[in-house]
Regions:
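Hydrophobic alpha-helical segments
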Residues: 1-179
Length: 179
């Protein structure tokens, strides 16, 4: 059970409902529990939503790359919520199920090419702490400066999301089904 109330739009004062409306418009699904928990601080929800939307829609890195990175963050950090939600996003982005099922073995699985391995290795190391120089050099072989910056911020953001999900004990929504 979540450690904070999971708020709906009508639970907020009228002055704060606009951010909830923006949230619902940008997500296109029923409102996720992480967002409902963050609605306890609507001012922060507003800023967090802006960053999250920019990372989803305003970057050069493709959706497949982003979702591989986010799945690795969720896997390494032990966040079932993040992993499950981004599993679905990865499938919708076009990543094959077989590849997702082999994620833990990305270093040796023939389903992953050198570019995939570079992003997954970076996401794993960055989530755990220090990124090796060799890992960074390999990442940079595949991504230019802008894309590398977007990857750094994306991985950092989703590691931050885990640091919200885990202590607040956010669980998957009753309506959520992993594909």
């Amino acid at each position: 059970m979540a450690r904070l109330p999971l708020l709906d739009r009508d639970d907020l004062p009228e002055v704060d409902r606009a951010v909830y409306d923006r949230l619902e418009a940008s997500r296109g699904t029923p409102t996720g529990n992480i967002w409902r928990a963050l609605a306890n601080a609507p001012n922060l929800l507003d800023r967090i939503l802006s960053l999250a939307d920019e990372l989803r829609h305003g970057v050069e890195i493709d959706k497949e790359t982003r979702e591989l990175a986010v799945l690795m963050v969720g896997l390494v950090a032990g966040s079932q919520y993040e992993f499950d939600h981004h599993w679905n996003s990865a499938l919708k982005a076009g990543l094959p199920r077989e590849k997702l099922e082999s994620l833990a073995d990305f270093e040796t699985s023939p389903l992953f090419d050198p570019r995939d391995r570079a992003i997954l290795r970076y996401a794993r190391e960055a989530t755990l702490g220090e990124v090796a120089d060799a890992t960074w050099a390999t990442l940079r072989k595949h991504f230019d400066e802008r894309q590398a910056t977007e990857i750094v911020v994306t991985v950092a953001w989703y590691a931050c999301v885990v640091r919200i999900l885990v202590p607040l004990k956010i669980e998957n929504e009753a309506w959520f089904k992993r594909l």
